């Protein structure tokens, strides 16, 4: 596996994986069914050796009988003002139209679930949560997408309460009793979901959809209990390689276009670990931990586990190149659909080429709210 580094901007190097930390499972086993009651993600790894049970937090915020925020809509058919709309042959949600650049149709839901599986494979213990957390706690997933992470956590911890929020109401209605979804919900708008009440808040793949990271981190900090943790998972999509196989390729040019277009919308997809850590510190977080994992674009590496990660990431990135490009390129550059598809087809072809030793970087952060006991 690529070496996990805790040092900012240290070069990613190759290292042999621990064979006991994973079991081989081919991509052909992936099930993209929409029920999501049981994904193929591995069990959650709890970092602490022993996690004592805790009573629900006492706070002044109103909750419904499930421990969720009172007055917040559960999953339901959206009213007319939230109807979906078509653009470039894809379906987008109408709530806060144009804020989020990605579609929400069946194809996109499959893509998000592929990334969910990829993250469990790439993080060598195949865990969903790395930060310390109580098994019967309150977990909040921001931008939950299909809800698969929240559902898996709810299955793992039946005595916990898990909530997911998202702009698009695409989560399944048949979720575990200890899991609730609130959508449409814009986590960048002012919100109160029980300040000082959550044991862990999770955010995955937020780059490209967030306008102000500092304000978001401050709001997350207010909602965590003292001593509780925030965990964030992001991908830096800038193509990298340790040789010259990327020189002059459309893959690099495509990313520069994508970077510029999303910067122009004030929601950049480019990820900076240095800025992320600085924003977390300025928001008031402590004990910030940063890990990096390399994601090969295709199985060019000889190592068996590297090839497994690469197969999953190749599937994920091949479903992402056009999806990430459609709205930014058409809305900002005013390119027509044929031009976008011509460019993205060439990029996908290069992503499949084993002679091109490209990779992206997966970034994982854990940050603690000061105070409270240590788990």
Swiss-Prot record:
One of its GO terms (biological process) is methylation. Disruption phenotype: Results in a complete absence of citrate production. Residues 15-26 have a biased composition (Polar residues). SUPFAM superfamilies: S-adenosyl-L-methionine-dependent methyltransferases (SSF53335). Signal peptide: none annotated. CDD domains: AdoMet_MTases. It holds the Pfam family Methyltransf_23. Belongs to the methyltransferase superfamily. LaeA methyltransferase family. This is Secondary metabolism regulator laeA. The lineage of its organism: Eukaryota, Fungi, Dikarya, Ascomycota, Pezizomycotina. The gene is laeA.
């Amino acid at each position: 596996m690529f070496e996990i580094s805790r040092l900012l901007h240290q070069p990613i190097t190759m290292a042999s994986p621990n064979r006991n930390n994973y079991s081989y499972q081919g991509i052909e086993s992936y099930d993209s069914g929409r029920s999501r009651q049981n994904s193929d993600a591995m069990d959650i790894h709890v970092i602490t050796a022993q996690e004592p049970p805790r009573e629900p937090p006492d706070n002044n915020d109103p909750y419904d009988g499930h421990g969720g925020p009172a007055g917040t809509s559960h999953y339901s058919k959206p009213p007319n003002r939230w109807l979906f709309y078509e653009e470039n042959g894809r379906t987008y949600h109408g709530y806060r139209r144009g804020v989020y650049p990605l579609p929400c149709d069946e194809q996109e839901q499959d893509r998000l679930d592929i990334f969910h599986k990829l993250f469990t494979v790439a993080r060598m213990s195949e865990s969903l949560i790395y930060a310390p957390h109580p098994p019967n706690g309150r977990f909040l997933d921001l931008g939950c997408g299909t809800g698969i992470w929240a559902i898996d956590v709810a299955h793992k911890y039946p005595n916990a309460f898990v909530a997911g929020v998202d702009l698009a109401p695409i989560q399944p209605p048949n979720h575990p009793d200890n899991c609730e979804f609130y959508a449409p919900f814009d986590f960048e708008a002012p919100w109160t979901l029980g300040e000082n009440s959550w044991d862990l808040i999770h955010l995955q793949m937020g780059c490209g959809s967030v306008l102000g990271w500092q304000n978001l981190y401050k709001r997350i900090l207010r909602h965590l209990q003292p001593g509780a943790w925030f965990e964030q998972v992001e991908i830096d999509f800038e193509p990298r390689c340790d040789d010259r196989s990327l020189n002059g390729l459309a893959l690099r040019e495509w990313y520069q276009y994508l970077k510029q277009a999303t910067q122009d919308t004030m929601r950049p997809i480019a990820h900076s670990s240095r800025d992320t850590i600085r924003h977390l510190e300025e928001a008031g977080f402590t004990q910030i931990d940063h890990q990096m994992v390399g994601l090969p674009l295709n199985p060019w590496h000889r190592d068996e586990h590297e090839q497994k990660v690469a197969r999953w990431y190749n599937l994920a990135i091949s479903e992402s190149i056009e999806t990430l490009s459609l709205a930014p390129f058409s809305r900002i550059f005013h390119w027509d659909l044929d031009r976008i598809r011509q460019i993205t087809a060439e990029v996908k072809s290069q992503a499949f080429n084993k002679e091109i030793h490209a990779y992206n970087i997966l970034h994982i952060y854990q940050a603690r709210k000061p105070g409270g006991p240590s788990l």
